[in-house]
UniProtKB/Swiss-Prot annotation:
Its EC number is 2.7.8.7. Mg(2+) binds at D7, E57. Keywords: Cytoplasm, Fatty acid biosynthesis, Fatty acid metabolism, Lipid biosynthesis, Lipid metabolism, Magnesium, Metal-binding, Transferase. GO terms for molecular function: holo-[acyl-carrier-protein] synthase activity; magnesium ion binding. Transfers the 4'-phosphopantetheine moiety from coenzyme A to a Ser of acyl-carrier-protein. This is Holo-[acyl-carrier-protein] synthase. It catalyses: apo-[ACP] + CoA = holo-[ACP] + adenosine 3',5'-bisphosphate + H(+).
Length: 141
């Protein structure tokens, strides 16, 4: 393991932020994330996206922790969040897709890596944990 990151999102506050007139907050989500969220009615949309937002934050925190003692490769205000996309398989298990431009920056700073992701919801909260590990070649993959 290289490092771990976690994030917790208050869903009602997140929903309020999404609903603000003129808000461009949806731009932090990739097309696939927005498409999946649009299939959920009402607050389920915000709940779904809150988990995805927590996952993106958890990834950035894990990456930042991996280079502890060094300046961030990308200042937080310059992160292009849509380059970090959460996808799910048909059973709902989640993984991260990191766009090639960002993936290159991550690999240049920490080496060859893989991610493990978990998202959970309980009541008014969504949480995510992201673990960065060194990539290891396996025969069974």
């Amino acid at each position: 393991m290289i490092s771990i990151g976690t994030d917790l999102v208050h869903i009602p506050a997140f929903a309020d932020q999404l609903a603000q007139p003129g808000s461009s907050f949806m731009d932090v989500f990739g097309a696939g994330e927005r498409r999946l969220a649009s299939r959920r009615a009402g607050n389920r949309n915000a709940e779904h996206l809150a988990g995805r937002w927590a996952a993106k934050e958890a990834f950035i925190k894990a990456w930042s922790q991996a280079i502890y003692g060094q300046p961030p490769v990308i200042p937080e205000e310059d992160v292009q969040w849509a380059l970090i996309e959460v996808r799910a398989d048909r059973w709902g298990r989640v993984a991260l897709d990191i766009a090639p431009s960002l993936d290159t920056q991550v690999r240049e700073s920490i080496g060859d890596y893989t991610t493990s992701l978990s998202i959970s919801h309980d009541g008014d909260y969504a949480t995510a944990v992201c673990v960065l590990s060194y990539a290891v070649a396996t025969e069974n993959r």
